[in-house]
Regions:
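Membrane-embedded, hydrophobic transmembrane alpha-helices
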Residues: 2-195
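Transmembrane signal-anchor helices characteristic of membrane glycosylation enzymes that use polyprenol
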Residues: 22-38, 85-99, 176-179, 204-231, ...
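Membrane-interface micro-motifs in multi-pass membrane enzymes
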Residues: 48-61, 100-104, 263-264, 287, ...
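Membrane-interfacial entry segments at the cytosolic side of transmembrane helices
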Residues: 76-79, 133-134, 157-168, 195-208, ...
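Membrane-embedded helix bundles of polyisoprenyl
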Residues: 85-89, 144, 211-215, 286-305, ...
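Transmembrane helix irregularities
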Residues: 94-97, 157, 277-278, 305-306, ...
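Active-site lumenal/periplasmic loops and adjacent helix-entry segments of GT-C-fold
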Residues: 216-305, 310, 314, 325-331, ...
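Membrane-lumen/periplasm interface segments of specific transmembrane helices
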Residues: 390, 403-460
Length: 460
């Protein structure tokens, strides 16, 4: 009997292999024909044969091997980090993107520091690990929400504009740096976890190659950033000083007749301090940081279930998908929206795993953040959060303790959401525009300024 079962198993394996071979013989030629029509004789083939495309691909290959050598061959961590930073700075300088990436990165750092200050105020028992990836994601979420809230209040109550917000950002940054410096001086070595990093770490060739691919793919977008801007970016994303804040705050009615100017402007409000500068690169380079955050968050979700090695593999795979990476060089809100949606899912999964109320509140914070970034996020974020919420309720996993739950963060996240939506309501009489106009009409809710939303995309 066992011998008969083995024979049957052998026959089934042979049949499976035969089926796979037949499918491969049918699929491979069709795939090759499609690739040839798209990338050889098609429009993409023409683009790939352009000199600037070939030059950039050659640069990326060289960049990959430079990163690979630095990560794989250099064991001393400080020297490895210095080499990677030098390679990155050199590439950005060649492509005239260094200043933009540096300034936008400094603004990201300010948001992280602001969020960290808020988190430490709510985390009295010091449960959250400093300088940890998940902690950093929470800090960025809290800092971004608080900054948008401050800008909304400044616009609503005092009519502050872009210049005032730049000054406010510099003041906040100075205060945070000074306060943190004093904290570190009094904490000693216990408050400086980077002192505990080992001097040398050996990284395998496989892991080094993955990290090198990720860095090269991210810098590929930085290299493309200054070539040209897409239509939607020029249409509204890069013109905040004209279509959002013309000096009197974000609630000033500038008389625009295009529906896109009535969208939820959370990202544009957040980036007011780096808008209206001599180059659009400052705004666009912030999107590259958001795409990097998307890769990191996706890696954290994978690491939560299958470990760090697979997490790096996931990040490598995602960094090679054009649909994800191309969002990093457009001024549209897609990149940060995806980032915040992944952060929301990460904190929901962490709550299911660890049953800490802080994760649940942070998931709600991330959900509210997505609502101010993109009108259609109401559909997709609600679907994702609702599915996770139903799972938590149906499996009876809802456990909530107010202590250490970060519940005070809702004190500025909810007003932030309402204040961004208030701008749309003020200009149109509707809380949301875009694809929701027909829904409002079916419910009998009419636009008080119909030219704003019925004008479609007919003009600026």
């Amino acid at each position: 009997m066992p011998e008969k079962n083995r024979n049957r198993g052998g026959i089934m394996k042979r049949r499976e292999w035969a089926s796979l071979i037949i499918l491969a013989l049918a699929a491979v030629p069709a795939l090759l024909v499609a690739i040839g029509q798209v990338y050889v004789t098609g429009v993409d083939g023409i683009r790939l044969r352009r000199p600037e495309t070939i030059e950039l691909l050659a640069e990326i290959i060289v960049l990959f091997f430079l990163y690979l050598f630095a990560i794989w061959k250099i064991d001393r961590n400080r020297l490895r980090a210095g080499a990677a930073l030098l390679i990155t700075a050199g590439f950005l300088w060649i492509h005239q993107a260094f200043t933009a990436m540096f300034l936008s990165g400094a603004y990201v750092l300010v948001l992280l520091m602001l969020g960290a200050r808020l988190r430490r105020g709510m985390d009295r028992n010091h449960v959250w690990r400093e300088y940890h990836v998940i902690t950093g994601l929470a800090d960025f979420l809290l800092g971004s929400g608080c900054m948008i809230f401050l800008f909304c209040i400044g616009s609503l109550l005092f009519g502050c504009g872009i210049r005032s917000f730049r000054l406010l950002t510099v003041i906040i940054a100075g205060f945070l740096i000074g306060f943190r410096f004093m904290e570190l001086r009094t904490a000693g070595d216990d408050g400086k976890p980077w002192r505990q990093i080992p001097k040398e770490t050996k990284i395998s060739l496989e892991m080094s190659a993955c990290i090198a691919i990720i860095l090269a793919m991210v810098l590929l977008q930085a290299g493309r950033m200054n070539i040209c801007a897409d239509y939607d970016s020029l249409h509204y994303g890069l013109r905040s000083e004209y279509v959002l804040d013309n000096g009197g705050g974000i609630y000033e009615n500038l008389g625009m007749v295009n529906v896109v100017y009535t969208y939820s402007k959370g990202l544009e409000t957040l980036l007011l301090p780096i808008s209206g500068l001599p180059s659009y690169g400052f705004f666009l380079s912030f999107q590259i940081w958001m795409t990097l955050g998307t890769l990191i968050t996706a890696g954290q979700i994978v690491e939560l279930f299958v470990g760090r090695k697979h997490a790096v593999g996931c990040m490598t795979l995602l960094s090679c998908i054009p649909g994800i990476m191309n969002m990093s060089i457009t001024a549209k809100t897609d990149s940060m929206t995806v980032f915040m949606q992944l952060v929301m899912l990460l904190f929901l999964l962490l709550y299911i795993r660890r049953k800490k109320g802080a994760y649940l509140v942070l998931a709600v914070d991330a959900y509210l953040m997505t609502l101010v970034l993109k009108p259609t996020a109401l559909v997709f974020s609600t679907a994702a959060a609702g599915t996770a919420g139903l799972y938590i309720l149906l499996t009876k996993q809802l456990r909530f303790k107010f202590r250490g739950s970060f519940l005070p963060s809702l004190g500025f996240m909810i007003p932030m959401w309402l204040l961004i939506w208030y701008r749309t309501w003020l200009h149109t009489g509707l809380p949301l525009t875009s694809v929701f106009n027909s829904i409002w009409a079916a419910l009998g809710i009419t636009d008080s300024h119909q030219s704003n939303t019925d004008g479609g995309n007919c003009g600026p």
